[in-house]
Amino acid sequence: MATSSAWKLDDHPKLPKGKTIAVIVLDGWGESAPDQYNCIHNAPTPAMDSLKHGAPDTWTLIKAHGTAVGLPSEDDMGNSEVGHNALGAGRIFAQGAKLCDQALASGKIFEGEGFKYVSESFETNTLHLVGLLSDGGVHSRLDQLQLLIKGSAERGAKRIRVHILTDGRDVLDGSSVGFVETLEADLVALRENGVDAQIASGGGRMYVTLDRYENDWEVVKRGWDAQVLGEAPHKFKNAVEAVKTLRKEPGANDQYLPPFVIVDESGKAVGPIVDGDAVVTFNFRADRMVMHAKALEYEDFDKFDRVRYPKIRYAGMLQYDGELKLPSRYLVSPPEIDRTSGEYLTHNGVSTFACSETVKFGHVTFFWNGNRSGYFNEKLEEYVEIPSDSGISFNVQPKMKALEIGEKARDAILSGKFDQVRVNIPNGDMVGHTGDIEATVVACEAADLAVKMIFDAIEQVKGIYVVTADHGNAEDMVKRDKSGKPALDKEGKLQILTSHTLKPVPIAIGGPGLAQGVRFRKDLETPGLANVAATVMNLHGFVAPSDYEPTLIEVVE
């Protein structure tokens, strides 16, 4: 394949070309203290254990959350999409809030397919904006909402309703009044310019709408009743009065404000969501939007009685769940990622085999390749998707397709056709999400068996392996209090954790083809997933592009 000078990689001064390299991503496999809720620790995982305990210079931990994967803060859990973006791209691209800021500042948000879709309701129907009213910057930001309202009004929105959720968690309790007053002033200005703009409903973030991890669907239902049905136990003529009054209720604060609706002079709710309306959820952080998005988007829904399910045009600020593709429409697209490691390696003649089962196949191909479909060079690449089990929860068959993935990888390695064999083994994440601890232990054991199968093949061809993960999950299956102890609910029951975690993930290198003297560097302050691409390029015998995050390895004579 002809290589233009722009794509040509320099030869590594110390590491040879020509070694078969297996790149293994264990999905949802973080590192945490060993206890009964650490399914990785409790599973028989001899292959992974041998890496951790066998060679301290070739096993280490890297970050897979927060700023290391382009998310705004260290409170942001990683996920499979941003994780594979970072693994494949070798650089950190803005995700989440940063991406929204850029799209709003440039105006690109108003040119995208998502905004065009919701704007089709502007002429005859209402635009509803739902989210956390705060400048905390963790889930949402007031200035982004203000720009969204302004831009929508300038582009034809004639009737706007805002459904606010007060914060008091990421900002000071009591600050809600000021945020409501600021928003109300903006809406007054719009009304003076002929746009019918009002706050329509509200409530506290921990009590209305913003539940997460399917902890309490009643929270979502309270929001649904206020926003869609126009029903709530408290009715007010304006939102400032509502927040000030409800804060005086016993036990109430910004986080736990009871739901309210704004009504007109006749006592009728001013802004229930009805057929033909457009709805935008303006939080950029995903975790507290997914449940509400399901209620808005899924026709087949059984978590609570919605009473009615309006036919709306719904878009999220972002897509909140890449695996569920939820919501299916969104205002801000994923980052534009160029010059990925996969594209560089193909331009330099490296042949690649990539494989996973359906639930993570897109991650080891599309997301790895910078949100790009298809092959860079079909003569040098082969992607294989193994169909995932369907119609059952993953804890029913926790082994999933791990062994089939291992077999495909083994066969690809032994075929001698590929320089790189890349897989994602989904078990730890997909079974971890079910909250079934026993099944997740089985899942981790199956993943380790697949790893062993790949290691054995690498041994036969005298190749190299790189094993890492995209984020944590299976290593901690219980919610914890501030002291780190398992948290209990009001009835004294253990609170199971079904989400990703903030834990670091392991990375290990090895195999008979690994040159003598290769070890992980100790001088990198906070290495993360984005450092993996340069590392893999080095092991293929190349120096990574100068703007890539630095390699994790060094060669000691």
From Swiss-Prot:
Gene Ontology annotations of biological process type: glucose catabolic process; glycolytic process; pollen development; response to abscisic acid; response to blue light; response to carbon dioxide; response to cold; stomatal movement
Subunit structure: Monomer.
Effect of loss of the gene: No visible phenotype. Plants missing both PGM1 and PGM2 have no detectable phosphoglycerate mutase activity and show defects in blue light-, abscisic acid- (ABA), and low CO(2)-regulated stomatal movements. The double mutant ipgam1 ipgam2 exhibits a severely impaired vegetative growth with pale reticulate leaves and don't produce pollen.
Function noted in UniProt: Catalyzes the interconversion of 2-phosphoglycerate (2-PGA) and 3-phosphoglycerate (3-PGA). Required for guard cell function (e.g. blue light-, abscisic acid- (ABA), and low CO(2)-regulated stomatal movements) and fertility (e.g. pollen grains production).
GO CC list: chloroplast; cytosol; extracellular region; mitochondrial envelope; plasma membrane; plasmodesma
Entry keywords, A to Z: Cytoplasm, Glycolysis, Isomerase, Manganese, Metal-binding
Similarity remark: Belongs to the BPG-independent phosphoglycerate mutase family.
Superkingdom: Eukaryota
Reaction(s) this enzyme catalyzes, per UniProt: (2R)-2-phosphoglycerate = (2R)-3-phosphoglycerate
Name this protein carries in UniProt: 2,3-bisphosphoglycerate-independent phosphoglycerate mutase 1
Residues holding Mn(2+) 2: 27, 80, 470-471
